[in-house]
Amino acid sequence: MSLPPNIYIVGAQCTGKTTLINNLRQHFQSNSPSQQFPPPTFITEVARSVLKTHSFTASDVIIPSRSLQLQHLILLAQASAERECSTQWFISDRSGADPIAYALRYVGAEETNKLLDSDEWTEIKDRMKKGVLIVCEASEEAASWLHNDGVRLMPKDISDWVAFHTLFCDFLDKHGIEHVVLPPSIGEHEARVEFVLRYWKSKFQSGST
C-alpha cells in the first residue's frame, strides 16, 4: 500500500501552526482520506515536551550555550517521533528544520553545523524532501496574531518576527527542501485547511513523493 506524503506545518511562532494542525485533525476525523490508506497520525508538542522534561524555559532559546543544547534535544525528539510513525503517514506540528533554524538565529552558523552533521538531521531531511512542507508566514499583515502564552519565545518586534520567517525559508531553500508559504491573507480556518489539502493532494497524485 502506497502511503500519501507526510505533512509538516512549520514556521515562526504565532503564525497559526497549532490552530491549523487542530483544524486538520478535525478534518480527517470527519473525512476519511481514502479507503486505500488510514487517516494520519499527528506529531505534536515535541518542543514543549522537551522544554518541560528537561526544565528549559523560552528565555533559554536566546542563550547560545543553552539554546544549542535545547535545539539538539528537540531534533532528537522529532527524529524519534517520526521513527515511531515509520509504518504510517503523519502530520507534524513543526519539523526537524525548526530547531536548526532557531539555532542559526540564536547560536550561530558554526555551532549549528553540529546539528547539521547529525544522523538525525540527515534522516529527517530525507523524509522532509518526500513530504509536503507548509510554512505559515510571519508578516506585518499577521501582526495581530502575536500572542504571548507564557511558554513560547516571543520576537522582539515585527521586524524580528519577519526576519526569522525569511531565515527559515532561506534555510529550506539552501537544503533543497521544497515548501510552500501559507500567507496570512488566507485567514479563514476552512480556507487554510483547503490550502494544505490542495497542495498535499497535488503532490500525492503527481507521484512526486
Model regions and ranges:
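A glycine- and Lys/Arg-enriched "phosphate-lid" helix/loop adjacent to the NTP-binding pocket
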Residues: 107-173, 180-187
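Hydrophobic anchor at the beta1->P-loop junction of P-loop NTPases
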Residues: 9
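Glycine-rich phosphate-binding loop used to anchor ATP phosphates in small-molecule kinases
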Residues: 69-128
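Hydrophobic positions on the alpha1 helix immediately C-terminal to the Walker A/P-loop
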Residues: 20
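The conserved Walker
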Residues: 13
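Conserved lysine of the Walker
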Residues: 17
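Conserved substrate/cofactor phosphate-moiety recognition/catalytic segment
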Residues: 26-77
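Phosphate-binding P-loop
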Residues: 1-4
